[in-house]
Amino acid sequence: GGGLLRKFLSFERLIRPDELVDIKRTTNEIEEDFARRPAGGPARPVNLDPGYLALSKVVLATTKDYSHRVYLGKGIYAEVTLHFREGRYEPWEWTYPDYRTEEYGKFFLEVRKCLREALHTRRETPKEEC
């Protein structure tokens, strides 16, 4: 709906893809906690969509099954939302419209640059400007 505020966060600590299940379960608990707040506010005031960025793709976690999603375990599925091709992240036919925008693409390219640096130097955290 209208009036939504969106914010992406990228963390310095690199994760293993198999951590995504527990991360999504934790964000679900956070969403439920916010939903239990006093009445009068939105039914779902916070929507957290964790995922990870790899050099070749952006993966999101979800609790909803669909033909292009892979079951990871504990009720969590993964979706490759974007794939890297010819210098940019490109959408698939199922990619949500907002993930197709130039603004989001720029953000993911910046995060990819930081990830490349972190992987190149074999550190757990990238340079300060990342």
Model-derived segments and spans:
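Long, contiguous binding/interaction regions
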Residues: G2-L5, I15-A35, A39-E129
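A generic structural motif
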Residues: K7-F11
